[in-house]
């Protein structure tokens, strides 16, 4: 514990918690302070001016990060027949129909992302209480209920990240690893931020992006000037 506390304290040296950093400087500082013995995940959090308790202020979507996430993603596909074969050929890790529903209902979830063909949704709908709280329920709005099984599987494994605003108006995601070069991390952050901005709901009033922060798994969070994150 003492070693961990010492590392955390050292990682905070040279960081001003009150300063609003430009994205480039923030990414550089976060990378420099990601000194754990594992490849830390770099995360971005955006505080939005929305109240997700209202349906017209919900923010959700999916973005394909240009440089991937750096993590291996296990994908499950609910499909039958030719579409099940297509899913396997595309690289899905788990494929099935009724039997897969039973396995998931039994509490075994050996995957990170879930895709379903439209005809499977009456069955998959039974898994709402299991998959919903984990943010894994297939949804056509984010491309996980689709007949394009190949495209969905490849997107999921290639860097697709789903996002959904939480109760406090915060949306966050892991957008890469500390081992990524700074430019790749910046590109991923900009892609994520642009997707969140484009997903601005009709009910959002006033300042939409209030605060942005970037951090690593074990490092301090740095405040980022929202004006520096747009890819435009």
Curated annotation (Swiss-Prot):
<keyword id="KW-0687">Ribonucleoprotein</keyword>
<dbReference type="InterPro" id="IPR028364">
    <property type="entry name" value="Ribosomal_uL1/biogenesis"/>
</dbReference>
<keyword id="KW-0820">tRNA-binding</keyword>
<keyword id="KW-0699">rRNA-binding</keyword>
<comment type="function">
    <text>Binds directly to 23S rRNA. The L1 stalk is quite mobile in the ribosome, and is involved in E site tRNA release.</text>
</comment>
<dbReference type="InterPro" id="IPR023674">
    <property type="entry name" value="Ribosomal_uL1-like"/>
</dbReference>
<dbReference type="GO" id="GO:0022625">
    <property type="term" value="C:cytosolic large ribosomal subunit"/>
</dbReference>
<dbReference type="InterPro" id="IPR016095">
    <property type="entry name" value="Ribosomal_uL1_3-a/b-sand"/>
</dbReference>
<dbReference type="GO" id="GO:0006417">
    <property type="term" value="P:regulation of translation"/>
</dbReference>
<keyword id="KW-0678">Repressor</keyword>
<dbReference type="InterPro" id="IPR005878">
    <property type="entry name" value="Ribosom_uL1_bac-type"/>
</dbReference>
<dbReference type="GO" id="GO:0000049">
    <property type="term" value="F:tRNA binding"/>
</dbReference>
<keyword id="KW-0689">Ribosomal protein</keyword>
<dbReference type="Pfam" id="PF00687">
    <property type="entry name" value="Ribosomal_L1"/>
</dbReference>
<protein>
    <recommendedName>
        <fullName>Large ribosomal subunit protein uL1</fullName>
    </recommendedName>
</protein>
<dbReference type="GO" id="GO:0003735">
    <property type="term" value="F:structural constituent of ribosome"/>
</dbReference>
<dbReference type="InterPro" id="IPR023673">
    <property type="entry name" value="Ribosomal_uL1_CS"/>
</dbReference>
<keyword id="KW-0694">RNA-binding</keyword>
<comment type="similarity">
    <text>Belongs to the universal ribosomal protein uL1 family.</text>
</comment>
<dbReference type="GO" id="GO:0006412">
    <property type="term" value="P:translation"/>
</dbReference>
<keyword id="KW-0810">Translation regulation</keyword>
<comment type="function">
    <text>Protein L1 is also a translational repressor protein, it controls the translation of the L11 operon by binding to its mRNA.</text>
</comment>
<dbReference type="GO" id="GO:0019843">
    <property type="term" value="F:rRNA binding"/>
</dbReference>
<comment type="subunit">
    <text>Part of the 50S ribosomal subunit.</text>
</comment>
<dbReference type="InterPro" id="IPR002143">
    <property type="entry name" value="Ribosomal_uL1"/>
</dbReference>
């Amino acid at each position: 514990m003492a070693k961990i506390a010492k590392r955390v304290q050292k990682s905070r040296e040279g960081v001003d918690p009150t300063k609003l950093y430009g994205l480039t400087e923030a990414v550089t500082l976060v990378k420099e302070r990601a000194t754990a013995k594992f490849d830390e995940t770099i995360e971005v959090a955006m505080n939005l001016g929305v109240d997700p308790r209202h349906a017209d202020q919900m923010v959700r979507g999916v973005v394909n990060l240009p440089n991937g996430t750096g993590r291996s993603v296990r994908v499950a596909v609910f499909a039958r027949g030719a579409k099940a074969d297509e899913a396997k050929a595309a690289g899905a890790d788990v494929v099935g129909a009724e039997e897969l529903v039973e396995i998931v209902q039994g509490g075994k979830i050996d995957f990170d992302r879930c895709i379903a063909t439209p005809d499977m949704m009456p069955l998959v709908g039974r898994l709402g209480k299991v998959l919903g709280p984990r943010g894994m329920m297939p949804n056509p709005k984010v491309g996980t209920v689709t007949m394009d099984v190949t495209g969905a599987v490849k997107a999921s494994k290639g860097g697709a990240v789903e996002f959904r605003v939480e109760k406090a108006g915060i949306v966050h995601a892991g957008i890469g690893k500390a081992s990524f070069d700074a430019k790749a991390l910046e590109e991923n952050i900009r892609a994520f931020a642009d997707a969140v901005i484009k997903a601005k709901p009709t009910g959002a009033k006033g300042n939409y992006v209030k605060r942005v922060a970037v951090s690593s798994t074990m490092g301090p969070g740095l405040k980022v000037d929202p004006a520096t994150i747009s890819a435009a």
